[in-house]
Amino acid sequence: MFRWSCAFRLSRSLLQTRFLSTDPLLDQFKICLSEDQVFQLVGKNKARLSVTHVGYAINLLWQFQKEKPRMLRTIGQVRGHPEFIALRILAENKIEFMDDKALVEILYNILRFNLEAHDSLVQQLVMEGWRRLERFNLTALSKFAVCLVEQHMNMSPLMGRIASIVDGTLDDVQDARILSSLMVSIYGVISPTLRDRLVDKADSLVDTLDVSHFNHPRRIVQFLRNMKYTYRPLLEKCNSVFLQNVGQMDPENLSIIIGLYQSLQFNNAEFRLMARARLIETMDQCSDVASYTKLFAALGPMAGQDIREKLEEGILTMADEMNPTQLLAILGTMEEMECRNTLLIAKISSLLQKYLESYRPVELARITQAIVTLRCQTPELFSMLQKILERLLKSSFIPADVSMLARVISTLPAARVDEEILSKVDAILPQCSLSDLSSLALAIVKWVRTDQPSRSSTSGGLGNLLLKLNTCGRERIAKIDKIDLFLDELKYTTGDWLEEVLLKDTISTCERLIDQVTWKNVPEFALFITRTNYLCAQVLDKIALVATEDITKIHYSATYATLLPFVVLNYDPPNGEAFFDACIQHFLPHLNSFDPHLVVLLAYSLALAEYFPEELIKAVFNVDFLGRLDAQLETFSSALNMRIRLRLMELNRAVCLECPEFQIPWFHDRYCQQLQHRANGGISSVQRQIHQLLGEILGGINYAKVSVMTPYYHAIDFECILDKNKKPIPYLDQNVLSADLSKVQWGNGGPLQETKSLPPGAQRVAIEFLDSKAFSKNSSNIKGEYVMKKRHLEILGYHVVQIASFEWNSMELSTKDAWIDYLRKRIFADDV
């Protein structure tokens, strides 16, 4: 820092000696080495100060502050100094004499000192800038836009005018710094068309970027986050720049980029691993509260247990020095880490109580969600939060805020609502988006469940409110005529309200807007259909048709989302073979560009539909790939880590059973044994009923085995064995008749044979009870994972009987005799 400061001063001295002095006063400013010297000059020469002097003095004061570490800056002292106030008055009096560059520079520098937006100088500079807007060059325009953002004028007519100028001059922009700055400033007032033009322009300029300037692509990614637009080609280019600069990034920059990626649901394993290594490397350098907070936020969710414990210890020692913003960041990270450090949770909760009144509604919502998730044991904090949240809700007129506050209030212990809150919710319902309505539905349902029976008036009000909410939801869905708007609103719905109340209306709208399905929205549309668990052939056929025709326009990583509803819902479209082949051929050349976990998910989804591309399978079951996968999973949350490992096991099992020619070894024995050890061994009342009926059908309870684990660790509800004459065989020797993987061998024809367990000609029968999860919402069609399980059991030599819950609970099977007859026909079928 000292060397830089000396160089800065020396460069000014050298510059001074090179030219013949034409402005002695300016020369005196140039040799100033501190704020005090600047203020002395200003005080002695107020009458002589020109626009140039004023602008230079203000800029110099900011440069002195920039040289200092954040913790040592004295912005408040400078702002309150009498000579700084004099500079502001002089600047305001000389605005008409400023050129465009000086005007914008003075506005920018004066805002560094945290002046209020209503400050007279700031207002006059902004007004003059508005008058000159059309003649600003792009550099001045971008800096002026940054100043407006800092004054919270993102959505102002003035910002809209800047966006219009950018729209007209975009072809002339050749500087990524200027473009990225403008993109971040004007994002809130641009059309989809201008958004696409900005993205295309950024895409072309990133290729020409000096890779050391990582702040420019960071702002581009920030723009994409602000627009909620995951445009992967541009994200990957920006990520490439970040990868080349990770070694130079500090925790703050890494934390920002990681947060942006999370918001965009963009994963890059290489960046996460490099970022984690860099953050661990900088741990010892982060000794102050500000840097350690950023380190904790970035590294905590990706760190192993030892590093986490060290980070938590550091936070405990610094917590008392943290400001409200830092405490909020720490709490959010603790939630993401699934922190169970009760001492740290209690400490942060206690400190938060001092600042609750200073937080904005959205921040209070985050605090409430976090302390509920972390199971905070501080009743005083919950009580204070409830009072503040209720007060804010009653005074708010913004639908999004009311719905958000209602949702978080409903999560508080023993939450109660009064008539004023219900009245407020009732008033804003017609203005709510689908995501707002879903939040309110979640809150109202919770209030109904916790409402005391004696409060009948409130209970009735809640019921009527829920009915009105459902009506508003149906009306809003019916009015939407743009599929992209429809998908955007549905993306942020929470809870079961949509699936339980509005599902048919939603699917009807999908059918109504089906002609608007294009390659641009196919992946998002497919993900939504998967989420609904609703098999609509018309919609799925359209997705398959558009994807097949325009597969080259869809980003290769989006093929997973595009395929998902077909494999999950077990639906084969009319052009099924062409559709699957087009998707497979599209992503195969890019396998090395996929994150490891996505390759596993993609391979598993194809396995559900009986597609096993050899290149994909060999890529997964490769020592180097599995090593990269393990490294990536270490940076994931425990839930996502477990999900990917489960899918890898299921893929390994599917390949071993269905594609023995690939000669992929089975290496999940220990993993499956651990899963089996943790599993809940209880059975449901329906399963208990079926077991008793099987005893009557087969001749005794010892003829049917419950909760059987097969080779390759498929869990089946019941197993029985029939001899070659279809006579039941009792389980006399459990050790002999239980399936044993060591006795399983490949037969000549491919299927697995168990060589020593069964008498000649005997047949194992697997009996499975399929509850509603095994079917789509509107169909008796069995979903993909249950179809795959049946295939595997048949390969293992089982005759598989799948009992559908809707059949078992139907009117036709409402008596014991009917159930017995149903089971007997299925078990002793002719094809057994």
UniProtKB/Swiss-Prot annotation:
It comes from the Eukaryota. Pfam families: FAST_1, FAST_2, RAP. It is found in: Mitochondrion. Coiled coil: none annotated. Keywords: Mitochondrion, Transit peptide. May regulate the stability of some mitochondrial mRNA species. PANTHER family: FAST KINASE DOMAIN-CONTAINING PROTEIN 1, MITOCHONDRIAL, FAST LEU-RICH DOMAIN-CONTAINING. This is FAST kinase domain-containing protein 1, mitochondrial.
